[in-house]
Amino acid sequence: MDGDNQSENSQFLLLGISESPEQQQILFWMFLSMYLVTVLGNVLIILAISSDSRLHTPMYFFLANLSFTDLFFVTNTIPKMLVNLQSQNKAISYAGCLTQLYFLVSLVTLDNLILAVMAYDRYVAICCPLHYVTAMSPGLCVLLLSLCWGLSVFYGLLLTLLLTRVTFCGPREIHYLFCDMYILLRLACSNTHIIHTVLVATGCFIFLTPLGFMTTSYVRIVRTILQIPSASKKYKAFSTCASHLGVVSLFYGTLAMVYLQPLHTYSMKDSVATVMYAVVTPMMNPFIHSLRNKDMHGALGRVLRRLFQRPK
């Protein structure tokens, strides 16, 4: 009980990835620029989809929710990082750290599950086009998204509650960008074997199951596309999946760089990979999804024209 009280009343120091004032200034402007680009890109995606009735389809419904998740994700971490880079007070309360961790886990999980649902949408559209309207009905889309949210909220709550049973002692200095589960476990002075086992087991289920589902879906999609006789139709089918594959590759690639390693080897060198998945991935997603998408180009153009159109 004393350990719990000690943890509840303590603070952590988010020291970031550099203590050099010159480097901190560079990092501040870099992260601020990336944050603004991320917010602008994802807000434009949401506005374009919501304002264009031609984009009111399951694929764009899930894309808008993915953009919302990415927007929430960077807002959970980057503003605090920017404050720490400009301030001498780098403290974050125990409750604040747990709150940041909860949203971090929940939103990464939600991103992962939405990507899996988007793969299912592409599978039905290409492999079972005659059943697409019934298989991806509005009611089912809302149900799938609700399940994604429910599971993400539960998983974030589970890991956060488990961490409340951990006792922290000694210097509570986090040489990292934000409160991360692996980093916090390294600061613990109580036995973390059970929570580490739960973390690995649930993490494998939550992330590898959707990855396996997406891999299976795309194997079947590729087989179906290769059977299409028309070269132009093949290209169109591949192009509808290319952006999703790009986002999935970036998402899982950066997560693997950070988390597919033993806890005791987790060190400062992983900060670059963390920046990739925590900042770069949400920033790049809008560009990847709209790069070769003519429908998105048109919708974004109409949104921008309305925003900058002078009132008569």
Swiss-Prot record:
Which pairs are disulfide-linked? C97-C189
Q: Which Pfam families match?
A: 7tm_4 (PF13853)
Q: Which residues cross the membrane?
A: 26-49, 58-79, 101-120, 141-158, 197-220, 238-260, 272-291
Membrane side Cytoplasmic: residue ranges: 50-57, 121-140, 221-237, 292-312
Q: What's the domain of life for this entry? A: Eukaryota
Q: Which residues lie on this side of the membrane: Extracellular?
A: 1-25, 80-100, 159-196, 261-271
Membrane-topology descriptor: Multi-pass membrane protein
Statement: the UniProt record of this protein carries the keyword Transmembrane: yes
Give the main location: membrane
Q: Which UniProt keywords apply?
A: Cell membrane, Disulfide bond, G-protein coupled receptor, Glycoprotein, Membrane, Olfaction, Receptor, Sensory transduction, Transducer, Transmembrane, Transmembrane helix
Q: Which Gene Ontology cellular-component terms appear in the entry? A: plasma membrane
Record: glycosylation sites: N5
Q: Name one GO biological process term.
A: signal transduction
Enumerate the InterPro entries for this protein: GPCR_Rhodpsn, GPCR_Rhodpsn_7TM, Olfact_rcpt
Q: Does the keyword Transmembrane apply?
A: yes
**Where does this polypeptide localize?**
Cell membrane
Q: What does this protein do?
A: Odorant receptor.
Record-stated family: Belongs to the G-protein coupled receptor 1 family.
Q: What is this protein called?
A: Olfactory receptor 1D5
To which species is this protein native? Pan troglodytes
